[in-house]
């Protein structure tokens, strides 16, 4: 009997132990099923989650931040593209592209990322929202703070930085109590539309370019911007099929013929979109040939008298001899061609001193690029222009180059042709030089005196 009692007790103990083991196994399975046991995520999963959480974001994430998240890269390459330095990083199933403007010391920031050949949405088409003040260091003075939200930041200690940064009408600012004293971006943007140096006074006198055609040869254009859409008489594309709107054309058009920003707001605009990124002069030559043909057409109501091209790379490009022939032909047909080349007309840039009278030549300082003695200086920096990002978007530029100065001079030439249609192209250049007023920074263009001198040539 005792033996059977021990046997039954042992069987019971085994059953209890087995049950406990089964319960433990099921508990472990349930625990794992609920995801409570950490598993190692793949780099692809880490990237997807970081993008979803906003930890990886367009123009905010740096290469070091990505490496801290994913570890050492599998491969990286560095190359130049235009004015940018492009850094490409590769991880298993991941390709990442960073970029920075070479002329500035800002870090490279994220431009594009793909996982398993599928591009991720990192916010390229959305406004960039700065998370903290350190994010300010990631933006350069070329693109600046356009379409950036700074609403979450306290900017009172960043006046020096803000004075170097362009921005646009889409930039979101914090309240006035979080801005530096005296810094008013809305006023800067509006004041920057004024061409300055008495141009608007000439407009009130009826000298606004009416009846005269100006051709701008540049990159593909946002055609419906409210600043110049109603001045666009003709648009023709040459060898740019499939190329989207570029940033260069809208500012140039608005400086020349813009209704609020322009020197000649009533002129007729002829626009030729060309591949300026190709080292070949033929597209410019072809455009000038077509303009001469248009001028010969009796149905052309506003003949083109001025051409504005914001580049000066012609000697370094193919078909330079053909280009020189085109310039000669244009002059023979009474057309003044204004470019950024300095072979026939020396000119340079001014930047407006904000808060000063824009019509006073003493309210300007020299631009960032040096010029030779005797160069005629025209406003370019601290100006507002049309933006390529939307039909009602405007950009306030800080420093500017020759590209913004050429259309200003071209606009003045349009005014000259309105006042005296018979004036020779060379005479326009001579009078711009003779009527410039001397200031502490150099010879500043003087539109009113220039137009008076043009009128005097008509009377002679």
At which residue positions do the language-model features occur?
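N-terminal domain-start motif of subtilase-like serine proteases
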Residues: 186-214, 238-241, 358-362, 446
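Autoinhibitory propeptides
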Residues: 121-190
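Subtilisin-like serine protease catalytic core
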Residues: 201-214, 219-233, 241-284, 300-304, ...
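Bacterial N-terminal signal peptides
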Residues: 19-28
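Extracellular S/T/G-rich loop segment that most often corresponds to the catalytic His/Ser-adjacent loop
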Residues: 218, 332-418, 422
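C-terminal subdomain of the subtilisin-like protease fold in secreted/lumenal serine endopeptidases
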Residues: 11, 302-309, 321, 418-460
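Residues within mature, well-folded domains
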Residues: 33-125
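Substrate-binding/access-modulating region of protease and related hydrolase catalytic domains
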Residues: 275-353, 397-407
């Amino acid at each position: 009997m005792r033996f059977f009692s021990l046997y039954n007790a042992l069987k019971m103990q085994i059953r209890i132990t087995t049950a406990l083991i089964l319960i433990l196994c099921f508990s472990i399975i349930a625990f794992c099923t609920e995801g409570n046991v950490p598993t190692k995520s793949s780099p692809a999963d880490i990237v997807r989650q970081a993008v979803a959480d906003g930890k990886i974001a367009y123009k905010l994430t740096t290469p070091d931040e990505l490496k801290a998240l994913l570890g050492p890269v599998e491969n990286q390459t560095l190359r130049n593209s235009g004015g940018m330095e492009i850094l490409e990083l590769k991880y298993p199933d991941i390709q990442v592209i960073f970029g920075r403007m070479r002329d500035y010391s800002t870090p490279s920031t994220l431009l594009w990322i793909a996982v398993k050949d599928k591009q991720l949405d990192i916010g390229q088409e959305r406004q960039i929202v700065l998370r903290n003040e350190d994010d300010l260091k990631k933006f350069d003075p070329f693109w600046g703070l356009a379409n950036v939200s700074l609403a979450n930041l306290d900017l009172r200690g960043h006046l020096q930085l803000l004075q170097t940064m362009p921005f646009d009408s889409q930039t979101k600012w914090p309240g006035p109590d979080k801005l530096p004293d005296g810094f008013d971006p809305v006023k800067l943007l509006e004041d920057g539309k004024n061409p300055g140096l008495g141009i608007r006074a000439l407009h009130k006198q009826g000298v606004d370019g009416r009846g005269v055609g100006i051709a701008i040869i540049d990159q593909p254009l946002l055609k419906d911007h409210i600043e110049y859409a109603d001045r666009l008489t003709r648009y023709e594309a040459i060898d740019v099929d499939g190329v989207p709107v570029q940033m260069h054309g809208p500012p140039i058009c608005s400086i020349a013929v813009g209704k609020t920003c322009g020197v000649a707001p009533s002129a007729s605009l002829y626009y030729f979109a060309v591949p300026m990124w190709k080292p070949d002069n033929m597209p410019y030559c072809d455009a000038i040939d077509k303009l001469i043909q248009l001028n010969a057409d009796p149905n052309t109501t506003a003949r083109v008298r001025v051409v504005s091209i914001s580049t000066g790379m012609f000697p370094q490009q193919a078909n330079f001899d053909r280009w020189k022939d085109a310039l000669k032909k244009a002059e023979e047909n009474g057309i003044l061609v204004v470019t950024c080349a300095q072979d026939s007309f020396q000119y340079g840039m001014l930047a407006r001193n904000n808060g000063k009278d824009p019509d006073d030549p003493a309210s300007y300082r020299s631009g960032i690029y040096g010029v030779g003695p005797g160069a005629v200086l025209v406003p370019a920096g601290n100006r507002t222009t049309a933006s390529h990002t939307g039909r009602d978007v405007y950009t306030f530029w800080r420093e500017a180059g020759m590209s913004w100065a050429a259309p200003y001079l071209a606009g003045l030439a349009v005014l000259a042709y309105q006042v005296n249609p018979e004036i020779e192209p060379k005479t326009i250049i001579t009078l711009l030089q003779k009527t410039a007023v001397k200031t502490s920074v150099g010879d500043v263009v003087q539109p009113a005196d220039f137009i008076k001198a043009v009128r005097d040539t008509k009377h002679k």
